[in-house]
Amino acid sequence: MTNSSGRRRPDVTTVEIIGGPEALEIGLSDYDARWAETYLRHRRRILDALGADVDVEHIGSTSVPGLAAKPIVDIVVAVADITSEEDYLDALLAAGYELRVREPGHRLVRTPGRDVHVHVYERGAAAVHEYLLFRDHLRADADDRALYENVKRALFEQPWNDMNDYSDAKSDVILAIKSRAGAARR
């Protein structure tokens, strides 16, 4: 049974970070073509676990050839109903992923080795569009790719007590690049 939004139940209203804050203990690596291979292996694992009725894309810096990145492969999965965790979460946990974040509209599971992060959103979520817009623009625009890498390298010169703080520090440059990416698509 679904409600008027088409969901089975209301979504969570708070952010739950399982395990608490974690220090950022890794640095940037030059682009490694094996990241694409890692993505393909995990794409297959996700599809085997969830079936074909999900969208799976490689996102983040490891999805952009030539871009330095933290050696963590980011994947986005779009499901029919984010609130119906029974349709995807148990299967992802059984496939070897661990739940790290549960927040409104988003779940994050990752490998125990923390080298693959799987972001789960509802199909049609704005965040999925934003991830793909950013990825595709960086793949096509060498100047913005270089700008983004330079900002990341500068940020890695300082210590970070929490990986989320490092991500937040990139927000301004990401917003500027996404603005240019959106304008280029019009």
Swiss-Prot record:
This is UPF0157 protein SCO7215. PANTHER family: GRPB DOMAIN PROTEIN (AFU_ORTHOLOGUE AFUA_1G01530) (PTHR34822), GRPB FAMILY PROTEIN (PTHR34822:SF1). Belongs to the UPF0157 (GrpB) family. InterPro entries: GrpB/CoaE (IPR007344), NT_sf (IPR043519). Coiled coil: none annotated.
